[in-house]
Amino acid sequence: MTAKLKLLDEDGIYEHLFERYSLLQKHANELKQDLGIVSRSSGDLEVSFEPQPGSHVKEHFNFEIAQSLSSLNSSRDNNNSTTGYVVWSTTPFFLQWLLYSPSGAIFGKGGTIEVEGDASHSAYELPAIFGSRTVDTDESSDVPAAPQHIIVELGAGIAGMLCVALANYVDKYVCTDQKGLLNGLKRNIKHNIDELRLRNMESSTLDFEISRRTALKTELDVLDLDWESFGLKSSNFHTLITPAGPSTVCILSMDVVYNEFLIAPYLRTLKKLLQTYEKSGNTSFAILGIQLRDQDVVEMFLSTAVVQFELKVCAIVDSEIDKTRFGLYYITTQ
């Protein structure tokens, strides 16, 4: 089955969740019945990604990740906000799906996708997540510069897998999370930076850069961004998440929806970013990955996003996703 989008309105949310949780019951014997931590037994993980025959991305990736199980269970670390200290299953699933599945290809490269539930459209034109600008751009040229392709990750945690792998395919990648998690994130990025091998890499926040034999480059940075305080004191964004010119900005979030208290701060941050990027003449959208645990929390998130924050939320419908405990959502402003 080719992937399609299903636009969710207030009534459609209940139908969508009924279908997804029914599929969870159907596949219950094949799925792990846990919270989704990749490993509860080891502080050091090896995670590999291999292309399948016919995959649109041919590169393979091997990561060695240091996580902190003691910090996960601590009541003192990072003001008791500790889920980011370990690796959660949504991230490797999404990366494998985006890079190697036929359904993920349309999101990476852009293109036309069927949509259900929109009375005005039978299909949407998706902007590409991936794209390239060469290192030496002639600034004196009258030809408009090609748009940058940027990923801003909200709630990156300490793993660093998404940023290192996907920085191979975009012009700029900014990982954001709470301050207490950033040192662990930086260490994992540095340890696995050899997996960023298709581009030169520059950074203003990491203590190293890399040079490759290519005209392509990426900027890779790490930024403290707390949803509860974001945008309250100033309407200006940090320069790292402010595009310098016309850009396509993808906001990624993996497994950040797991209790009701985070829903409003996350959605407020997401909407502010999307609206500001659009007002500045950029193309912006978000992809959110959720592990389907408590149905009430997922329902509250989707309802709050659609009704209170008036965001356009589409479920990504794909047979590969249907067989898992994960949900992927494509989100834009109205």
Swiss-Prot record:
Its EC number is 2.1.1.-. Coiled coil: none annotated. This is Ribosomal lysine N-methyltransferase 5. S-adenosyl-L-methionine-dependent protein-lysine N-methyltransferase that methylates 60S ribosomal protein L1. GO terms for cellular component: cytosol; protein-containing complex. Belongs to the class I-like SAM-binding methyltransferase superfamily. RKM5 family. Keywords: Methyltransferase, S-adenosyl-L-methionine, Transferase. The lineage of its organism: Eukaryota, Fungi, Dikarya, Ascomycota, Saccharomycotina. It comes from Lachancea thermotolerans (strain ATCC 56472 / CBS 6340 / NRRL Y-8284) (Yeast).
